[in-house]
C-alpha cells in the first residue's frame, strides 16, 4: 500500500513538473517558439479551436513567425485571434500567410518575465510539496491502521522525501534555464 502511495505521489509530482514546463514554454524569450501560440483559441466555424490545429508555423528569423493556415478560409479568424491575444504582436495578412513580427524585449520586460517565471516555479514547488504532504498523511494513516510496519512507513517517507527533492530540483533547473534564456540578449 505504501508503494502504491509513493507511485501515485510521483505521478502527481511529475505532472506538476510537466505543467511548469508548459508554463515556462509560454513565457516569451528573445527567441520565439510556436509554444507561445499554444493558448490561443480561434473561433473556427463557431467552435473554439487551438491555433496549432488550424495552421503550421515557420520561424525564419528569431523574432518572426509565419503562420500558414491549412484552410485559407480560416486566415482572418486566425489573424483576429492572434491580434486579440496578449502576445503584443500585430499580425499582417498577405492573403495566404500571416506574418507576426515580435518586438525586441526591453530590459524591464525581461526582468518582469523573470518574475513571472519565478512565480510559476514557486507554484510548481508548492504543488509538489502539497502532494508530499498528502502522501505523508496517507503513509501515516496506513502505519497507524496497522496495514504496514513503522520501518516500512519510515522507508516510505524517506523515499517520498527523495522524490520531492528530485522533482523540486527539476523545477529549479527549468527555472534556471528559463532565467538564463530570458536574460541573455
Swiss-Prot record:
Localization, UniProt: Cytoplasm
SUPFAM superfamilies the UniProt entry points to: Ribosome recycling factor, RRF (SSF55194)
GO cellular component: cytoplasm
Keyword Secreted: no
Main location as per UniProt: cytoplasm
Residues annotated as transmembrane: none
Alphabetic keyword roster: Cytoplasm, Protein biosynthesis
InterPro entries documented for this protein: Ribosome_recyc_fac, Ribosome_recyc_fac_dom, RRF_sf
Any single Pfam family the record assigns to this protein: RRF
Gene3D superfamilies (alphabetical): 3.30.1360.40, Ribosome-recycling factor
Keyword Magnesium: no
One GO-annotated biological process of the protein: translational termination
One Gene Ontology term of the molecular function aspect: ribosomal large subunit binding
Family: Belongs to the RRF family.
Functional summary from the UniProt entry: Responsible for the release of ribosomes from messenger RNA at the termination of protein biosynthesis. May increase the efficiency of translation by recycling ribosomes from one round of translation to another.
NCBIfam families associated with the record: frr
Protein name: Ribosome-recycling factor
Organism encoding this protein: Frankia casuarinae (strain DSM 45818 / CECT 9043 / HFP020203 / CcI3)
